[in-house]
Amino acid sequence: MLEFETIDINLTKKKNLSQKEVDFIEDVIIVGSGPAGLTAGIYSVMSNYKAAILEGPEPGGQLTTTTEVYNYPGFKNGISGRNLMLNMREQVVNLGAKTFPETVFSIKRKGNIFYLYTENYIYKSKAVIIAVGSKPKKLETLKNSGLFWNKGISVCAICDGHLFKGKRVAVIGGGNTALSESIYLSKLVDKVYLIVRKNNLRAIAMLRDSVAKLPNIEILYNSEAIEVDGKSSVSSVKIFNKKDNVVYELEVSAVFMAVGYKPNTEFLKGFLDLDEEGFIVTKDVVKTSVDGVFSCGDVSNKLYAQAITAAAEGFIASVELGNFLK
């Protein structure tokens, strides 16, 4: 099975003035390598289009940090997010798509050709599919969280959970991500406090049932984390219970934020129409404000952030690509 290549790229780095322009023009370049981008690649090459995938700083996308995916068709016992994405990548490569470990910093159109600028190269194509996904939001209202970033404040349990074995931690959120993170952490830590702003969980029933069976996960409903404290690292979090109108403190060694996602569209400002939250504005599901540029997955679909909907939109983008290139 193919493995993802580890990429160390500073996303704030300015464009390299000595970039080399590649000497080939693709029919389509797909920016991003999550379920949307890889599915778009699969269908594009199956339609005999020359396709290249610029994988970005996180090959495989957010799913590679998900322990188990239970709601993707075809896997009766679930599959790890990483293995699901490795399977997709192997499939698209076997079909003939090119993959490059590159991050796009800007896109320009000159005539009928799109120029995609990365750190080292300028790629060229007749059309572009944007599938860069989104990244976990930081909870800006949590006081002192910036002081303890990577010192007990995290947005990725699978990345950082091992640092807190045998300790007490908190997870903020009530959706699928928050419950998945809590379940994963429950296998490592002594206690998980799941801090839920509302009086119910938004996650799917399977995850809710799994959490209910785990004795070391305690759900705190109608609650907000308002402040973290500590010396060199997190040692406590203050909780405001809205129902009882009381503030109290929990001793924890880490706080994991699972409160939604922000689209990775900073490099598209001024090139495509974005909404007030930064998501790509689309019509007919995948068409953007620029002819020949299509968008699919979480970067434009903020209502249904699921692997299956991202993959479906990747297919739709490949169909619209065909209509554009005719």
UniProtKB/Swiss-Prot annotation:
Compartments reported by the entry: Cytoplasm
Could you tell me which cysteines form disulfide bridges? Answer: C156-C159
Coiled-coil region(s): none
Q: Sorted alphabetically, which keywords does the UniProt record give?
A: Cytoplasm, Disulfide bond, FAD, Flavoprotein, NADP, Oxidoreductase, Redox-active center
Reactions this protein catalyses? [thioredoxin]-dithiol + NADP(+) = [thioredoxin]-disulfide + NADPH + H(+)
Q: Which GO terms describe its cellular component?
A: cytoplasm
Extract the NCBIfam families matched here: TRX_reduct
Give the family this protein belongs to, as stated in its UniProt record.
Answer: Belongs to the class-II pyridine nucleotide-disulfide oxidoreductase family.
How the protein assembles, per its UniProt entry?
Homodimer.
Record protein name field: Thioredoxin reductase
Q: Could you read off the lineage of the organism from its UniProt record?
A: Bacteria, Pseudomonadati, Spirochaetota, Spirochaetia, Spirochaetales
By which gene is this protein encoded?
Answer: trxB
